[in-house]
Swiss-Prot record:
Pfam (any one): ArfGap
Domain Arf-GAP: 16-130
Keywords of this entry: GTPase activation, Metal-binding, Zinc, Zinc-finger
Organism superkingdom: Eukaryota
Protein name, UniProt field: Probable ADP-ribosylation factor GTPase-activating protein AGD15
Zinc finger regions, C4-type: 31-54
Gene name, Swiss-Prot/TrEMBL: AGD15
Amino acid sequence: MNRKASVSKELNAKHSKILEALLKHPDNRECADCRSKAPRWASVNLGIFICMQCSGIHRSLGVHISQVRSITLDTWLPDQVAFMKSTGNAKGNEYWESELPQHFERSSSDTFIRAKYSEKRWVSPGAIQPAPIVSQLSCKVSHLVESGYKPETPKKARTLSLDEEILLHHVLQVTPPETRTRAGSVDMKENVYVVPLPEFKKPNQKNENFSSEVNQNRRTTIAPPSSWATFD
């Protein structure tokens, strides 16, 4: 849907009165570029009032730089009127002509305007350009609605291919599961029985003495008699 179609005649007439009142302001009585009297055109995205001759040069710059509207012949949107009211020639030139020499010769409007807006020759470094943020957002939303934009729904998870399934199955078989087992308990999930280690008791003192005596007796040898008996 065209946003201009939503502007009623009553609202359009109200916008015209507001713009005419803005043109009566001392800062807006002259063209923002060539200083000619009684401008009847404007750049809605730059927020400045310009004369008919300069409006033609602005159109040649492209709508990405300057969007030209007639004060009385075109339909204005509420956010465009609000931006013109908040900016105007004085505030606009504070940005575009910040470093312009005081007595600069503006003999050629075409060359001057292109250097001013396309090249940004006299803009201070780090300066922030006045911009109709609300207008830019509303235009983007309107463009999305007109183009039938629909938010994307989350896509389903991709199914695994045959090769991927085989690889995953192999990895699950090879990789040992991380389990926490306790001694003497049965892990019902893994069906693994852990046998506890037997406890070894220290032998008492009597057994130690007995074993030492036995070992000592084993080491003793039987001595032969001093004289061997002979038998006839």
